[in-house]
Amino acid sequence: MSKNYHIAVLPGDGIGPEVMAQALKVMDAVRSRFDMRITTSRYDVGGIAIDNHGHPLPKATVEGCEQADAILFGSVGGPKWENLPPESQPERGALLPLRKHFKLFSNLRPAKLYQGLEAFCPLRADIAANGFDILCVRELTGGIYFGQPKGREGSGQYEKAFDTEVYHRFEIERIARIAFESARKRRRKVTSIDKANVLQSSILWREIVNDVAKAYPDVELAHMYIDNATMQLIKDPSQFDVLLCSNLFGDILSDECAMITGSMGMLPSASLNEQEFGLYEPAGGSAPDIAGKNIANPIAQILSLALLLRYSLDADEAATAIEQAINRALEEGVRTSDLARGAAAVSTDEMGDIIARYVAEGV
């Protein structure tokens, strides 16, 4: 008998509810084709939660997420709530507390150049023609953003500011394991990013990654300095499979990876804890300027569902079916307006219908 799964669905603001509706269509197709028992509960988060409950992350939403196997998150924020105190705004008051509450230490950001979308890549045509499919694995809770001491002191010519890069062995070990396990589901290559020629934290990082790699003899490991990595991503992104990064370096490289794909509407994201409980969301924002127009690209939200199936539900076959359905739609020239470039475009609803149908049919 198949296991019962429960997903907390948090559509949020802006285009969030529209693109989430398409992901739920695809979830229905997955249920039917793979005989998976998946139930969902919907909760307010972000600006809509402020309007309805007076807080961007209501207690009922947190409690609902605690009862779920994973969180499928839309997007939060918009001009309506920009003048609130920073800690009460949708982004800071909802997403960051959720990450902290569930101890989500790893961030996974796929960046893929899909066949037929090479013209959107800002790289040279001969580089884009090779394509790329990269997974950036970023450590989220350690490093220079959180290390102590940090602050400012002194005055005049002696005023100074300081931050501290701190990593513990256990933090590096667990994010490295995520990267190697992910590589086993892909092309079996990890490139670990550091600055071990200068930084003590990077020397420790490299030593521990080498130790973890011994448990994964089937996965190729390479090390690369961060400055070289930023250049190699421009020169030949096809050389990379999984990038393993500290918090700071991952922040930089994941955005660079996103930019060279040419479309934020195609980029999902996953944040996981040690139990592989995860929060899955599009990498883009709430896009309030196009909300309600039925023109938003839902693919990033649908791919976030695929990540959820793969990492939190261990349903790799279902995740692959979604990815293949999206590939098929794009290869057939199906485009939302952000990808159409003057050609005929389908609506948000139509793109969701097509992908759900292709999942149900199989490719």
Curated annotation (Swiss-Prot):
InterPro entries: IsoCit/isopropylmalate_DH_CS, IsoPropMal-DH-like_dom, Isopropylmalate_DH
Pathway per the UniProt entry: Amino-acid biosynthesis; L-leucine biosynthesis; L-leucine from 3-methyl-2-oxobutanoate: step 3/4
Cofactor descriptive note: Binds 1 Mg(2+) or Mn(2+) ion per subunit.
Residues involved in NAD(+) binding: 78-91, 285-297
Catalysis performed (reactions): (2R,3S)-3-isopropylmalate + NAD(+) = 4-methyl-2-oxopentanoate + CO2 + NADH
EC number: 1.1.1.85
Subcellular location: Cytoplasm
Molecular function in Gene Ontology: 3-isopropylmalate dehydrogenase activity; magnesium ion binding; NAD binding
SMART domains (alphabetical): Iso_dh (SM01329)
Primary site of residence: cytoplasm
Positions bearing the site annotation: Important for catalysis: Y145, K195
GO CC annotation, single: cytosol
Keywords: Amino-acid biosynthesis, Branched-chain amino acid biosynthesis, Cytoplasm, Leucine biosynthesis, Magnesium, Manganese, Metal-binding, NAD, Oxidoreductase
Matches recorded under Pfam families: Iso_dh
GO terms classed as biological process: L-leucine biosynthetic process
Record's subunit section: Homodimer.
Function: Catalyzes the oxidation of 3-carboxy-2-hydroxy-4-methylpentanoate (3-isopropylmalate) to 3-carboxy-4-methyl-2-oxopentanoate. The product decarboxylates to 4-methyl-2 oxopentanoate.
Family membership noted in the UniProt record: Belongs to the isocitrate and isopropylmalate dehydrogenases family. LeuB type 1 subfamily.
HAMAP family in UniProt: LeuB_type1
This protein's name: 3-isopropylmalate dehydrogenase
